[in-house]
Design a protein with these regions (language model features):
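NAD(P)H-binding glycine-rich loop region in Rossmannoid oxidoreductase-like domains
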Residues: 37-80, 88-90
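Mid/C-terminal beta-alpha module of Rossmann-like enzyme folds, strongest
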Residues: 206-260, 294-304
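C-terminal amphipathic/interface module of NAD(P)-dependent oxidoreductases
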Residues: 247-248, 261-304
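Glycine-rich Rossmann NAD(P)(H)-binding loop
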Residues: 187-196, 221-228, 278
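Rossmann-fold cofactor-recognition segment
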Residues: 29-39
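NAD(P)-dependent short-chain dehydrogenase/reductase
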Residues: 137-196, 203
Length: 304
């Protein structure tokens, strides 16, 4: 399978590339220097040249504070780019998979199923929800793959410092880095943060997306873990799996500037039962997921 993967140099994209290549796929990595995804002609040309079986769109403009300040660029970077890629997929006959997020929900609905109506509360969630509509309404062969609470290594920059943020990304890695250094780690507690989610190892999400590609599965999928957790529970489970000192954990307010404009949805738990049935697979449990993350962090090798 030949996959045109946007955002391959990013956190999520680097994990997808690792999984796809491990499964035998040829991954085409368009760099921003080579193609501006907001440039329709450039996208159509590079996709036509690549002749992919599938387009997996994971690239984002991740300067979240800027999304409300430069709304035109934000729209073009998310919705415009997705539209161009959907048109390119239609022209080439490829399936397009949009990597989306649990932040398309407002955080009040409890575990959200794949068909739960979206209701984002911040610019990032809105732009992703709008991009989902492009794929579901415009693409002849479209798939939305929502991921959630993503943990893992950045395979392009595996030794880069990790920090806690308003979402769950890098949470476990940041905690492990601190506690292994003998430093205290404050688990943030604030209703404006994403506090409950479905922790997911990025490579596990990649395996689910690969399974969807193999089965030519369309529609909206929840490519996530099989257990929910809040920040403190995830911290305690990680301490146990990584054999760290729980006495170094604190609970307190977030750092100044950590809350994004509009806040983050408080409870973004996903119900992925329909996805598991469609893909005929079991969803990974949290302890096993953390064990694989530990192996990846300690060996810098893909673990399964």
């Amino acid at each position: 399978m030949r996959i045109y993967l946007t955002g391959a140099s990013g956190f999520v994209g680097s994990n997808l590339a690792r999984v796809f290549e491990a499964r035998g796929a040829e991954v085409v990595r368009p760099a921003h220097a080579d193609v501006d995804l907001a440039d329709r002609d450039a996208v159509l040309r590079t996709v036509a040249d690549a002749r992919p079986d599938a387009i997996v769109h994971s690239a984002i403009w991740n300067a979240f504070a800027e999304l409300t300040r430069d709304r035109r660029r934000a729209w073009d970077s998310y919705v415009g780019a997705t539209r161009h890629l959907a048109d390119a997929a239609n022209g080439s006959g490829a399936r397009i998979v949009l990597i989306s997020t649990d932040w398309v929900f407002d955080g009040t609905q409890g575990p959200a199923a794949e068909d739960e109506p979206t209701n984002p509360i911040n610019a990032y969630g809105f732009l992703k929800a709008a991009s989902e509509l492009v794929v579901t309404e415009r693409a002849a062969r479209g798939t939305v793959a929502r991921i959630a609470g993503v943990q893992g290594l950045h395979w392009e920059r595996p030794d880069a410092p990790r920090t806690q943020d308003a979402g769950f990304g890098y949470f476990v890695a940041a905690l492990v880095d601190a506690l292994r250094a003998g430093e205290r780690f404050t688990v943030w507690d604030d209703p404006r943060l994403n506090t409950r989610a479905t922790p997911t190892l990025a490579t596990d999400a990649g395996e689910l997306i690969w399974r969807a590609l193999e089965r030519d599965a369309g529609g909206i999928l929840h490519c996530c873990g099989g257990e929910h957790a809040d920040r403190l529970e995830l911290a305690r489970r990680a301490v146990d799996v990584f054999e760290l000192d729980e006495e170094l954990l604190d609970v307190g307010p977030p750092d100044a500037g950590a809350v994004p404009p509009g806040g983050a949805p408080f409870d973004t738990r996903l119900d992925a039962a329909a996805t598991a049935r469609l893909l005929d697979t079991a969803l990974p449990d949290l302890t096993a997921m953390l064990g694989r993350l530990r192996a990846q962090m300690e060996t810098h090798c893909l673990s399964t």
